[in-house]
Amino acid sequence: MSAALGAVIGVLATLIVFTFVNRQKTFDGDYNRWRKLNLILQQIQENYVDTVDVKALTDAAVTAALGKLDPHSVYLPPVELEASETELSGNFEGIGIQFNVPNDTAIVLSVIPGGPSEKAGLQQGDRIIRVDSRDIAGQKTPQDSMVRLMKGPAGTKVTVTVDRAGEKIPFDITRDKIPVHCVDAAFMLDSTTGYIRLTKFTRTTYSEFISAAIKLKAQGMTHLIFDLRENTGGYLDQAYLLCNEFLEKGDKVVYMEGLHRSRSDLDADGRGSLKDIQLSVLIDEVSASSSEIFAGAMQDNDRGVIVGRRSFGKGLVQEPINFTDGSGVRLTVARFYTPSGRCIQKPYSDHYAYDIYERYTRGELTSADSIKVNTDEVYYTKSGRRVYGGGGIVPDVFVPMDTTRASNFYIQCNKKAVAMRFASAVFDRYRSELSQIEDFASLQSWMDSHKMDQQFLKYAAKQGLKPEPGEWEETSSYMMPQVNALVGRYSKLGEEAFYRLWIVVDKTVEEARKPHELF
Protein backbone atom coordinates (compact mmCIF):
# COMPACT_ATOMS: atom_id res chain seq x y z
CA MET A 1 0.00 0.00 0.00
CA SER A 2 2.66 2.51 1.05
CA ALA A 3 4.84 1.49 -1.89
CA ALA A 4 1.97 2.11 -4.32
CA LEU A 5 1.23 5.49 -2.78
CA GLY A 6 4.93 6.30 -2.90
CA ALA A 7 4.87 5.58 -6.63
CA VAL A 8 1.99 8.02 -7.05
CA ILE A 9 3.86 10.75 -5.17
CA GLY A 10 7.03 10.03 -7.09
CA VAL A 11 5.28 10.40 -10.43
CA LEU A 12 3.73 13.67 -9.30
CA ALA A 13 7.16 15.04 -8.36
CA THR A 14 8.55 14.01 -11.72
CA LEU A 15 5.73 15.77 -13.57
CA ILE A 16 6.36 18.96 -11.62
CA VAL A 17 10.15 19.12 -11.44
CA PHE A 18 11.35 17.82 -14.78
CA THR A 19 10.71 18.96 -18.35
CA PHE A 20 10.34 16.25 -20.98
CA VAL A 21 11.02 17.02 -24.60
CA ASN A 22 7.73 17.23 -26.50
CA ARG A 23 5.88 15.60 -23.55
CA GLN A 24 5.63 18.44 -21.06
CA LYS A 25 2.13 18.93 -19.63
CA THR A 26 0.92 21.80 -17.51
CA PHE A 27 -2.31 22.08 -15.56
CA ASP A 28 -4.28 25.11 -14.54
CA GLY A 29 -3.52 25.74 -10.87
CA ASP A 30 -7.13 26.73 -10.25
CA TYR A 31 -8.50 23.19 -10.41
CA ASN A 32 -10.26 21.70 -7.40
CA ARG A 33 -7.83 20.01 -5.01
CA TRP A 34 -9.99 16.90 -5.01
CA ARG A 35 -9.28 16.47 -8.74
CA LYS A 36 -5.57 16.14 -8.10
CA LEU A 37 -5.77 12.43 -7.30
CA ASN A 38 -7.77 11.73 -10.47
CA LEU A 39 -5.27 13.68 -12.55
CA ILE A 40 -2.34 11.80 -11.02
CA LEU A 41 -3.93 8.41 -11.65
CA GLN A 42 -4.83 9.45 -15.18
CA GLN A 43 -1.24 10.46 -15.89
CA ILE A 44 0.03 7.17 -14.48
CA GLN A 45 -2.35 5.21 -16.67
CA GLU A 46 -1.47 7.17 -19.81
CA ASN A 47 2.24 7.76 -19.35
CA TYR A 48 3.82 5.36 -16.84
CA VAL A 49 6.68 3.29 -18.24
CA ASP A 50 5.12 -0.11 -17.39
CA THR A 51 1.68 -1.65 -17.24
CA VAL A 52 -0.18 -0.53 -14.13
CA ASP A 53 -2.95 -2.27 -12.19
CA VAL A 54 -5.14 0.81 -11.94
CA LYS A 55 -7.66 -0.87 -9.65
CA ALA A 56 -5.00 -1.89 -7.13
CA LEU A 57 -3.44 1.56 -7.28
CA THR A 58 -6.81 3.28 -6.81
CA ASP A 59 -7.71 1.01 -3.90
CA ALA A 60 -4.37 1.76 -2.25
CA ALA A 61 -4.79 5.51 -2.72
CA VAL A 62 -8.35 5.49 -1.32
CA THR A 63 -7.31 3.34 1.63
CA ALA A 64 -4.40 5.65 2.41
CA ALA A 65 -6.59 8.76 2.14
CA LEU A 66 -9.23 7.37 4.50
CA GLY A 67 -6.50 6.25 6.88
CA LYS A 68 -5.60 9.90 7.38
CA LEU A 69 -9.08 10.69 8.72
CA ASP A 70 -9.82 8.40 11.67
CA PRO A 71 -9.40 4.71 12.58
CA HIS A 72 -12.97 3.80 11.58
CA SER A 73 -13.29 5.43 8.15
CA VAL A 74 -12.34 2.52 5.90
CA TYR A 75 -12.41 1.23 2.34
CA LEU A 76 -13.75 -2.31 1.96
CA PRO A 77 -12.99 -4.40 -1.15
CA PRO A 78 -15.93 -6.52 -2.41
CA VAL A 79 -15.06 -9.64 -0.39
CA GLU A 80 -14.64 -7.71 2.87
CA LEU A 81 -17.80 -5.66 2.30
CA GLU A 82 -19.85 -8.78 1.66
CA ALA A 83 -18.49 -10.42 4.82
CA SER A 84 -19.22 -7.30 6.87
CA GLU A 85 -22.79 -6.98 5.60
CA THR A 86 -23.44 -10.70 6.05
CA GLU A 87 -22.26 -10.54 9.65
CA LEU A 88 -24.80 -7.84 10.49
CA SER A 89 -27.68 -8.92 8.26
CA GLY A 90 -28.95 -11.64 10.57
CA ASN A 91 -28.60 -14.33 7.91
CA PHE A 92 -26.20 -15.80 5.39
CA GLU A 93 -26.40 -18.26 2.52
CA GLY A 94 -24.88 -21.66 3.15
CA ILE A 95 -25.61 -25.18 4.40
CA GLY A 96 -26.66 -24.43 8.00
CA ILE A 97 -24.21 -26.02 10.42
CA GLN A 98 -21.95 -24.94 13.24
CA PHE A 99 -18.65 -26.79 13.41
CA ASN A 100 -15.38 -26.86 15.31
CA VAL A 101 -11.91 -28.10 14.40
CA PRO A 102 -10.35 -29.67 17.53
CA ASN A 103 -7.63 -31.50 15.61
CA ASP A 104 -7.41 -31.23 11.84
CA THR A 105 -10.97 -32.32 11.03
CA ALA A 106 -14.18 -30.27 11.17
CA ILE A 107 -16.72 -31.77 13.57
CA VAL A 108 -20.37 -30.72 13.34
CA LEU A 109 -21.38 -29.13 16.64
CA SER A 110 -24.97 -28.43 15.67
CA VAL A 111 -27.29 -28.60 12.69
CA ILE A 112 -29.66 -25.65 12.33
CA PRO A 113 -33.26 -26.93 12.62
CA GLY A 114 -35.07 -26.78 9.30
CA GLY A 115 -31.88 -25.85 7.45
CA PRO A 116 -30.42 -27.50 4.34
CA SER A 117 -28.05 -29.79 6.24
CA GLU A 118 -30.77 -31.13 8.52
CA LYS A 119 -32.99 -31.79 5.51
CA ALA A 120 -30.13 -33.61 3.79
CA GLY A 121 -29.39 -35.76 6.86
CA LEU A 122 -26.24 -34.32 8.47
CA GLN A 123 -26.00 -34.99 12.19
CA GLN A 124 -24.23 -33.54 15.18
CA GLY A 125 -20.83 -35.21 15.55
CA ASP A 126 -20.32 -35.94 11.85
CA ARG A 127 -16.72 -35.38 10.75
CA ILE A 128 -16.47 -33.46 7.48
CA ILE A 129 -13.78 -35.00 5.31
CA ARG A 130 -14.56 -33.61 1.83
CA VAL A 131 -16.40 -30.68 0.24
CA ASP A 132 -17.23 -31.46 -3.39
CA SER A 133 -13.95 -32.92 -4.71
CA ARG A 134 -11.66 -31.21 -2.17
CA ASP A 135 -10.37 -33.18 0.81
CA ILE A 136 -10.32 -31.03 3.94
CA ALA A 137 -9.69 -33.58 6.70
CA GLY A 138 -6.06 -33.98 7.70
CA GLN A 139 -5.01 -31.23 5.29
CA LYS A 140 -4.54 -28.46 7.87
CA THR A 141 -7.17 -26.47 5.99
CA PRO A 142 -7.80 -23.12 7.74
CA GLN A 143 -11.25 -22.90 9.31
CA ASP A 144 -12.19 -19.79 7.33
CA SER A 145 -11.33 -21.65 4.11
CA MET A 146 -13.67 -24.46 5.15
CA VAL A 147 -16.42 -21.90 5.73
CA ARG A 148 -15.93 -20.40 2.26
CA LEU A 149 -16.15 -23.83 0.65
CA MET A 150 -19.49 -24.55 2.27
CA LYS A 151 -21.04 -21.10 1.89
CA GLY A 152 -22.52 -20.02 -1.42
CA PRO A 153 -25.60 -18.52 -3.09
CA ALA A 154 -28.98 -19.95 -2.16
CA GLY A 155 -30.09 -22.58 -4.66
CA THR A 156 -26.60 -23.80 -5.50
CA LYS A 157 -25.57 -27.34 -4.65
CA VAL A 158 -22.59 -28.74 -2.76
CA THR A 159 -21.62 -32.30 -1.86
CA VAL A 160 -20.38 -32.72 1.70
CA THR A 161 -18.83 -36.08 2.58
CA VAL A 162 -18.69 -37.01 6.26
CA ASP A 163 -17.22 -39.76 8.37
CA ARG A 164 -19.93 -41.17 10.64
CA ALA A 165 -18.74 -43.94 12.94
CA GLY A 166 -16.18 -45.04 10.35
CA GLU A 167 -18.56 -44.94 7.38
CA LYS A 168 -17.98 -42.35 4.64
CA ILE A 169 -21.31 -40.82 3.59
CA PRO A 170 -21.77 -38.16 0.87
CA PHE A 171 -24.65 -35.68 1.21
CA ASP A 172 -25.93 -33.52 -1.64
CA ILE A 173 -27.02 -30.25 -0.06
CA THR A 174 -28.83 -27.32 -1.65
CA ARG A 175 -27.67 -24.10 -0.03
CA ASP A 176 -30.25 -21.70 1.37
CA LYS A 177 -30.59 -18.61 3.55
CA ILE A 178 -29.55 -19.39 7.12
CA PRO A 179 -30.49 -17.26 10.14
CA VAL A 180 -27.58 -16.05 12.27
CA HIS A 181 -28.58 -15.57 15.89
CA CYS A 182 -27.04 -12.78 17.95
CA VAL A 183 -28.51 -13.95 21.28
CA ASP A 184 -26.07 -16.71 22.18
CA ALA A 185 -27.69 -17.67 25.46
CA ALA A 186 -30.75 -16.78 27.53
CA PHE A 187 -31.61 -18.61 30.75
CA MET A 188 -32.40 -18.21 34.44
CA LEU A 189 -29.48 -18.25 36.88
CA ASP A 190 -31.85 -18.62 39.82
CA SER A 191 -35.55 -18.07 40.51
CA THR A 192 -35.36 -14.29 39.92
CA THR A 193 -32.14 -13.61 37.97
CA GLY A 194 -32.04 -13.95 34.20
CA TYR A 195 -29.01 -13.91 31.92
CA ILE A 196 -28.85 -12.89 28.25
CA ARG A 197 -25.66 -12.84 26.20
CA LEU A 198 -25.66 -10.72 23.03
CA THR A 199 -22.77 -11.12 20.57
CA LYS A 200 -23.63 -8.43 17.99
CA PHE A 201 -26.16 -5.72 17.12
CA THR A 202 -27.56 -7.16 13.88
CA ARG A 203 -30.81 -6.57 12.00
CA THR A 204 -32.52 -9.18 14.18
CA THR A 205 -31.14 -8.08 17.56
CA TYR A 206 -34.25 -6.39 18.92
CA SER A 207 -36.63 -9.19 17.96
CA GLU A 208 -34.31 -11.88 19.36
CA PHE A 209 -33.62 -9.97 22.57
CA ILE A 210 -37.21 -9.04 23.39
CA SER A 211 -38.37 -12.60 22.68
CA ALA A 212 -35.76 -13.97 25.10
CA ALA A 213 -36.48 -11.32 27.75
CA ILE A 214 -40.24 -11.93 27.67
CA LYS A 215 -39.69 -15.68 28.14
CA LEU A 216 -37.39 -15.07 31.12
CA LYS A 217 -39.82 -12.58 32.62
CA ALA A 218 -42.54 -15.21 32.39
CA GLN A 219 -40.25 -17.53 34.38
CA GLY A 220 -40.02 -15.02 37.23
CA MET A 221 -37.14 -12.75 36.19
CA THR A 222 -36.93 -9.51 38.19
CA HIS A 223 -33.19 -8.93 37.63
CA LEU A 224 -31.49 -9.20 34.23
CA ILE A 225 -27.76 -9.62 33.72
CA PHE A 226 -27.19 -8.42 30.16
CA ASP A 227 -23.81 -9.58 28.85
CA LEU A 228 -22.24 -7.27 26.24
CA ARG A 229 -18.67 -8.45 26.75
CA GLU A 230 -16.77 -8.92 23.47
CA ASN A 231 -19.71 -7.33 21.62
CA THR A 232 -18.14 -5.00 19.06
CA GLY A 233 -21.40 -3.29 18.13
CA GLY A 234 -23.40 -3.04 14.93
CA TYR A 235 -26.58 -1.18 14.01
CA LEU A 236 -27.30 1.91 16.10
CA ASP A 237 -31.08 1.64 15.65
CA GLN A 238 -31.04 -1.77 17.33
CA ALA A 239 -29.19 -0.31 20.34
CA TYR A 240 -31.84 2.42 20.57
CA LEU A 241 -34.69 -0.11 20.48
CA LEU A 242 -33.11 -2.08 23.34
CA CYS A 243 -32.55 1.09 25.40
CA ASN A 244 -36.17 2.05 24.82
CA GLU A 245 -37.36 -1.11 26.57
CA PHE A 246 -35.76 -0.02 29.87
CA LEU A 247 -36.24 3.77 29.98
CA GLU A 248 -39.07 6.12 30.92
CA LYS A 249 -40.73 8.46 28.44
CA GLY A 250 -38.47 11.41 27.62
CA ASP A 251 -35.28 9.81 28.91
CA LYS A 252 -32.35 10.62 26.65
CA VAL A 253 -30.79 7.67 24.82
CA VAL A 254 -28.18 9.17 22.50
CA TYR A 255 -27.61 12.09 20.17
CA MET A 256 -25.43 12.42 17.08
CA GLU A 257 -23.77 15.44 15.53
CA GLY A 258 -21.12 16.19 12.90
CA LEU A 259 -19.81 19.06 10.83
CA HIS A 260 -22.17 18.18 7.96
CA ARG A 261 -24.83 16.47 10.09
CA SER A 262 -27.10 18.55 12.30
CA ARG A 263 -27.79 17.30 15.80
CA SER A 264 -30.20 14.37 15.97
CA ASP A 265 -31.61 13.27 19.34
CA LEU A 266 -33.13 9.90 20.20
CA ASP A 267 -35.33 9.78 23.31
CA ALA A 268 -37.29 6.93 24.89
CA ASP A 269 -41.03 6.79 24.19
CA GLY A 270 -41.95 5.15 27.51
CA ARG A 271 -43.56 2.10 25.91
CA GLY A 272 -40.88 -0.38 26.95
CA SER A 273 -41.85 -3.66 28.60
CA LEU A 274 -38.78 -4.01 30.84
CA LYS A 275 -38.92 -0.76 32.83
CA ASP A 276 -39.59 -2.67 36.05
CA ILE A 277 -36.62 -5.04 35.63
CA GLN A 278 -33.47 -4.51 37.70
CA LEU A 279 -30.55 -4.34 35.27
CA SER A 280 -26.85 -5.18 35.35
CA VAL A 281 -24.81 -4.63 32.16
CA LEU A 282 -21.53 -6.49 31.63
CA ILE A 283 -18.84 -4.82 29.51
CA ASP A 284 -15.14 -5.29 28.84
CA GLU A 285 -12.34 -3.77 26.78
CA VAL A 286 -13.79 -5.21 23.55
CA SER A 287 -17.35 -3.90 24.04
CA ALA A 288 -17.70 -1.11 21.47
CA SER A 289 -19.98 1.17 19.48
CA SER A 290 -23.64 0.11 19.96
CA SER A 291 -22.65 -1.76 23.13
CA GLU A 292 -21.32 1.53 24.49
CA ILE A 293 -24.45 3.41 23.42
CA PHE A 294 -26.55 0.98 25.47
CA ALA A 295 -24.21 0.96 28.47
CA GLY A 296 -23.84 4.74 28.36
CA ALA A 297 -27.59 5.33 28.24
CA MET A 298 -28.19 3.01 31.18
CA GLN A 299 -25.37 4.59 33.20
CA ASP A 300 -26.27 8.23 32.51
CA ASN A 301 -29.94 7.61 33.31
CA ASP A 302 -28.98 5.68 36.48
CA ARG A 303 -31.02 2.83 35.07
CA GLY A 304 -28.56 -0.04 35.43
CA VAL A 305 -25.29 -0.98 37.08
CA ILE A 306 -22.36 -1.31 34.67
CA VAL A 307 -20.04 -4.16 35.70
CA GLY A 308 -16.67 -5.22 34.28
CA ARG A 309 -13.85 -3.24 32.70
CA ARG A 310 -13.58 -0.01 30.69
CA SER A 311 -15.11 -0.41 27.24
CA PHE A 312 -13.29 0.01 23.93
CA GLY A 313 -14.05 3.69 23.28
CA LYS A 314 -15.66 3.99 19.82
CA GLY A 315 -17.86 7.07 19.67
CA LEU A 316 -18.04 7.60 15.91
CA VAL A 317 -20.93 7.00 13.50
CA GLN A 318 -20.18 5.60 10.03
CA GLU A 319 -22.30 6.01 6.91
CA PRO A 320 -22.07 3.35 4.17
CA ILE A 321 -21.18 4.36 0.61
CA ASN A 322 -21.37 1.38 -1.76
CA PHE A 323 -20.01 1.18 -5.30
CA THR A 324 -21.22 -0.79 -8.30
CA ASP A 325 -18.12 -3.03 -8.28
CA GLY A 326 -19.17 -4.45 -4.90
CA SER A 327 -16.71 -2.41 -2.86
CA GLY A 328 -17.64 0.32 -0.42
CA VAL A 329 -16.56 2.96 2.04
CA ARG A 330 -17.59 3.36 5.65
CA LEU A 331 -17.18 7.09 6.27
CA THR A 332 -17.38 8.68 9.71
CA VAL A 333 -20.04 11.41 9.48
CA ALA A 334 -20.83 12.14 13.14
CA ARG A 335 -19.95 11.53 16.76
CA PHE A 336 -22.45 10.07 19.16
CA TYR A 337 -22.96 11.44 22.65
CA THR A 338 -24.45 9.75 25.71
CA PRO A 339 -27.35 11.44 27.56
CA SER A 340 -24.97 13.37 29.85
CA GLY A 341 -23.26 14.86 26.78
CA ARG A 342 -20.06 12.84 26.74
CA CYS A 343 -18.40 11.46 23.64
CA ILE A 344 -16.66 8.24 24.60
CA GLN A 345 -14.37 8.10 21.55
CA LYS A 346 -10.82 7.46 22.73
CA PRO A 347 -8.03 9.62 21.27
CA TYR A 348 -6.56 8.69 17.90
CA SER A 349 -2.92 7.76 18.24
CA ASP A 350 -0.19 5.84 16.48
CA HIS A 351 -0.85 3.01 18.96
CA TYR A 352 -4.65 2.99 18.50
CA ALA A 353 -4.70 -0.60 17.27
CA TYR A 354 -2.65 -1.73 20.29
CA ASP A 355 -4.65 0.12 22.92
CA ILE A 356 -5.96 -3.01 24.65
CA TYR A 357 -2.45 -4.44 24.91
CA GLU A 358 -1.25 -1.14 26.38
CA ARG A 359 -4.08 -1.24 28.93
CA TYR A 360 -2.83 -4.66 29.96
CA THR A 361 0.82 -3.61 30.25
CA ARG A 362 0.03 -0.59 32.41
CA GLY A 363 -2.16 -2.71 34.70
CA GLU A 364 -5.59 -1.33 33.85
CA LEU A 365 -7.13 -4.73 33.18
CA THR A 366 -6.14 -5.97 36.62
CA SER A 367 -6.43 -2.83 38.79
CA ALA A 368 -9.16 -0.19 38.96
CA ASP A 369 -6.56 2.35 40.13
CA SER A 370 -4.85 2.11 36.73
CA ILE A 371 -7.93 3.06 34.68
CA LYS A 372 -7.05 5.99 32.47
CA VAL A 373 -9.76 8.69 32.47
CA ASN A 374 -9.77 12.21 31.10
CA THR A 375 -10.39 14.36 34.18
CA ASP A 376 -10.92 17.36 31.91
CA GLU A 377 -14.10 15.78 30.56
CA VAL A 378 -16.36 15.43 33.61
CA TYR A 379 -20.10 14.82 33.21
CA TYR A 380 -22.91 13.88 35.56
CA THR A 381 -25.63 11.25 35.57
CA LYS A 382 -29.27 11.96 36.48
CA SER A 383 -28.54 11.46 40.18
CA GLY A 384 -25.36 13.55 40.04
CA ARG A 385 -22.79 10.77 39.85
CA ARG A 386 -19.55 11.74 38.12
CA VAL A 387 -18.70 10.08 34.79
CA TYR A 388 -16.03 10.80 32.19
CA GLY A 389 -15.81 11.27 28.43
CA GLY A 390 -13.02 10.72 25.95
CA GLY A 391 -12.21 7.06 26.42
CA GLY A 392 -14.93 4.43 26.73
CA ILE A 393 -17.46 3.66 29.45
CA VAL A 394 -15.86 3.24 32.88
CA PRO A 395 -17.85 0.61 34.82
CA ASP A 396 -19.60 1.37 38.10
CA VAL A 397 -18.23 -1.88 39.49
CA PHE A 398 -14.76 -2.94 38.33
CA VAL A 399 -13.94 -6.63 37.90
CA PRO A 400 -10.28 -7.36 37.09
CA MET A 401 -9.11 -9.83 34.49
CA ASP A 402 -8.23 -13.00 36.35
CA THR A 403 -4.54 -13.74 35.75
CA THR A 404 -4.03 -15.93 38.82
CA ARG A 405 -5.64 -19.04 37.38
CA ALA A 406 -2.78 -20.20 35.25
CA SER A 407 -1.05 -23.31 36.54
CA ASN A 408 1.54 -24.91 34.28
CA PHE A 409 -0.76 -27.88 33.64
CA TYR A 410 -3.59 -25.53 32.61
CA ILE A 411 -1.30 -23.56 30.28
CA GLN A 412 0.08 -26.68 28.60
CA CYS A 413 -3.40 -28.14 28.13
CA ASN A 414 -4.56 -24.92 26.49
CA LYS A 415 -1.56 -24.86 24.17
CA LYS A 416 -2.48 -28.32 22.89
CA ALA A 417 -6.27 -27.73 22.92
CA VAL A 418 -6.63 -30.79 25.15
CA ALA A 419 -10.01 -29.75 26.57
CA MET A 420 -11.53 -29.30 23.10
CA ARG A 421 -10.16 -32.63 21.90
CA PHE A 422 -11.37 -34.35 25.05
CA ALA A 423 -14.89 -33.00 24.52
CA SER A 424 -14.90 -34.42 21.00
CA ALA A 425 -13.72 -37.80 22.31
CA VAL A 426 -16.44 -37.81 24.99
CA PHE A 427 -19.07 -37.13 22.35
CA ASP A 428 -17.82 -40.01 20.20
CA ARG A 429 -18.00 -42.35 23.19
CA TYR A 430 -21.33 -41.22 24.66
CA ARG A 431 -23.17 -39.89 21.62
CA SER A 432 -26.41 -41.80 22.24
CA GLU A 433 -26.50 -40.87 25.94
CA LEU A 434 -25.87 -37.16 25.30
CA SER A 435 -28.57 -37.07 22.62
CA GLN A 436 -31.17 -38.18 25.18
CA ILE A 437 -30.46 -35.46 27.76
CA GLU A 438 -33.38 -33.00 27.76
CA ASP A 439 -32.58 -30.47 30.51
CA PHE A 440 -29.68 -28.86 32.34
CA ALA A 441 -30.20 -30.69 35.63
CA SER A 442 -29.99 -34.03 33.82
CA LEU A 443 -26.81 -32.90 32.05
CA GLN A 444 -25.14 -31.98 35.34
CA SER A 445 -26.19 -35.29 36.87
CA TRP A 446 -24.84 -37.18 33.86
CA MET A 447 -21.47 -35.42 34.10
CA ASP A 448 -21.18 -36.13 37.82
CA SER A 449 -22.00 -39.81 37.34
CA HIS A 450 -19.44 -40.17 34.55
CA LYS A 451 -16.66 -38.53 36.59
CA MET A 452 -15.53 -36.12 33.88
CA ASP A 453 -12.57 -34.92 35.95
CA GLN A 454 -11.05 -38.40 36.19
CA GLN A 455 -11.67 -39.09 32.51
CA PHE A 456 -10.05 -35.78 31.59
CA LEU A 457 -6.91 -36.49 33.62
CA LYS A 458 -6.54 -39.88 31.93
CA TYR A 459 -7.00 -38.29 28.51
CA ALA A 460 -4.45 -35.55 29.26
CA ALA A 461 -1.96 -38.17 30.48
CA LYS A 462 -2.21 -39.91 27.09
CA GLN A 463 -1.20 -36.57 25.56
CA GLY A 464 1.85 -36.52 27.82
CA LEU A 465 0.44 -33.99 30.31
CA LYS A 466 0.13 -34.57 34.04
CA PRO A 467 -0.37 -32.05 36.86
CA GLU A 468 2.30 -31.77 39.52
CA PRO A 469 1.50 -33.24 42.97
CA GLY A 470 -1.08 -30.98 44.62
CA GLU A 471 -1.57 -28.89 41.47
CA TRP A 472 -4.84 -30.46 40.32
CA GLU A 473 -6.79 -29.64 43.48
CA GLU A 474 -6.58 -25.92 42.70
CA THR A 475 -6.50 -26.15 38.91
CA SER A 476 -9.62 -28.32 38.68
CA SER A 477 -11.77 -25.61 40.28
CA TYR A 478 -11.44 -23.43 37.19
CA MET A 479 -10.43 -25.93 34.53
CA MET A 480 -13.25 -28.44 34.86
CA PRO A 481 -16.02 -25.86 34.28
CA GLN A 482 -14.27 -25.11 30.97
CA VAL A 483 -14.02 -28.82 30.14
CA ASN A 484 -17.63 -29.48 31.15
CA ALA A 485 -18.82 -26.51 29.09
CA LEU A 486 -17.13 -27.89 25.97
CA VAL A 487 -18.67 -31.32 26.58
CA GLY A 488 -22.08 -29.79 27.29
CA ARG A 489 -22.03 -28.01 23.94
CA TYR A 490 -22.32 -31.45 22.29
CA SER A 491 -25.62 -32.09 24.05
CA LYS A 492 -29.05 -31.03 22.78
CA LEU A 493 -28.76 -27.91 24.93
CA GLY A 494 -25.87 -26.58 22.81
CA GLU A 495 -24.76 -23.01 23.55
CA GLU A 496 -27.04 -22.71 26.58
CA ALA A 497 -25.26 -25.65 28.20
CA PHE A 498 -21.88 -24.16 27.31
CA TYR A 499 -22.58 -20.82 29.00
CA ARG A 500 -24.43 -22.26 32.00
CA LEU A 501 -21.50 -24.53 32.79
CA TRP A 502 -18.85 -21.88 32.08
CA ILE A 503 -20.60 -19.20 34.13
CA VAL A 504 -19.86 -21.11 37.33
CA VAL A 505 -16.40 -19.51 37.44
CA ASP A 506 -17.31 -16.19 35.82
CA LYS A 507 -16.34 -13.55 38.39
CA THR A 508 -18.04 -10.73 36.47
CA VAL A 509 -21.38 -12.52 36.55
CA GLU A 510 -20.77 -13.33 40.22
CA GLU A 511 -20.24 -9.62 40.94
CA ALA A 512 -23.31 -8.63 38.94
CA ARG A 513 -25.50 -10.90 41.07
CA LYS A 514 -24.58 -8.96 44.21
CA PRO A 515 -26.65 -5.95 45.36
CA HIS A 516 -25.06 -2.60 44.45
CA GLU A 517 -26.71 0.55 45.78
CA LEU A 518 -25.20 3.26 43.58
CA PHE A 519 -28.14 5.58 42.97
Segment roles from a protein language model:
Residues I128-I129, V158, I344, V387:
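Generic structural signal for buried aliphatic residues
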Residues V21-R33, L41, Q45-V49, D53-V54, ...:
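Cleft-lining beta-strand/loop regions that shape enzyme active-site pockets
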Residues Y31, E46-L109, G155-A185, L501-R513, ...:
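Extended, small/polar residue-biased N-terminal targeting/export presequences
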Residues S290, D302, R309, G313-V373, ...:
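Polar, glycine-rich mid-to-C-terminal structural blocks
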Residues S2-T19:
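Hydrophobic membrane-insertion alpha-helices, especially the h-region
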Residues C343-I344, Y348-F519:
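Conserved functional hotspot residues or short segments at active or partner-binding sites
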Residues A137, P170-D172, R330, Q345, ...:
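A sequence-level detector of short linear motifs
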